[in-house]
Amino acid sequence: MGIKTFAPRSHGRRGMTGFDFKEITKTTPEKSLLAPLKKQAARNNHGQITIRHQGGGHKRKYRLVDFKRNKLEVAAKVIAIEYDPNRTCRIALISYIDGAKAYILAPVGLNVGDTVISSDKADIKPGNSLTLGAIPVGTVIHNIELRPGKGGQICRGAGASATLAGKGDKYCQVRMPSGELKQVLTVCRASIGQVGNTDNENINLGKAGRSRWRGIRPSVRGMHMNPVDHPLGGGEGVGKGHHPVTPWGQPCKGFKTRNNKRTNSSIIKRRK
């Protein structure tokens, strides 16, 4: 895996970087693990925009990635590393000894021919899945469950990882990428290693068109909108006039907006 640069033959190519895709070993996805993916353009069932700056983009098929890793005590062999347009990391196609196939997130150090397994007796090596209670303290982990059996929800993007900071009888302490220290049930599962494609953060798209291919629409500043569209709109675009706010009037710089009391008890130390 590496980054390639482009000759500045146009304004869009100047400074543009991309992947060389040398780690990809299979270019066509496994048909049995594909599902249709209909674009919603970030609208809900009423047609209202629920997430701004999304829409368009290249047509995709969804890859059915196994985040639960609940096929226990059955070894699987990595037969391919593939590209997934729906996420920033690569995915690994694995084949179990009983013939079943599945996609998993490809961590750093996982190669074709390696063997992975979901078992509390498994070795501590990239790709294996264990319960948090069976993982040694200090291990780097990803694809972490927050509820037993629900599947991994934390640390699934390119280069993401968390650290198992401590263990107790019922809960384990996990240090999240944000610096937050969170307690998670020891029966929740996690995969060993750091998610692959760590160079993703170093990619320079180079031009607006590459963002549009990804389904990302332009972000317009509020002070360049009309007064009807944003609290900072109007005034010939000369200045804000007051503190920066969201389109709904909420302060957006240095103002804490978290109001999730349900999970407060699981947070040992807040993120910085």
Curated annotation (Swiss-Prot):
GO terms for cellular component: large ribosomal subunit. Keywords: Ribonucleoprotein, Ribosomal protein, RNA-binding, rRNA-binding. Residues 247-272 are annotated as: Disordered. One of its GO terms (biological process) is cytoplasmic translation. Residues 262-272 have a biased composition (Polar residues). Pfam families: Ribosomal_L2, Ribosomal_L2_C. One of its GO terms (molecular function) is rRNA binding. It comes from the Bacteria. The keyword Ribonucleoprotein applies. InterPro entries: NA-bd_OB-fold, Rib_uL2_dom2, Ribosomal_uL2, Ribosomal_uL2_bac/org-type, Ribosomal_uL2_C, Ribosomal_uL2_dom3, Ribosomal_uL2_RNA-bd_dom, Translation_prot_SH3-like_sf. The keyword Electron transport does not apply. One of the primary rRNA binding proteins. Required for association of the 30S and 50S subunits to form the 70S ribosome, for tRNA binding and peptide bond formation. It has been suggested to have peptidyltransferase activity; this is somewhat controversial. Makes several contacts with the 16S rRNA in the 70S ribosome. Belongs to the universal ribosomal protein uL2 family. Part of the 50S ribosomal subunit. Forms a bridge to the 30S subunit in the 70S ribosome. This is Large ribosomal subunit protein uL2. The lineage of its organism: Bacteria, Pseudomonadati, Bdellovibrionota, Bdellovibrionia, Bdellovibrionales.
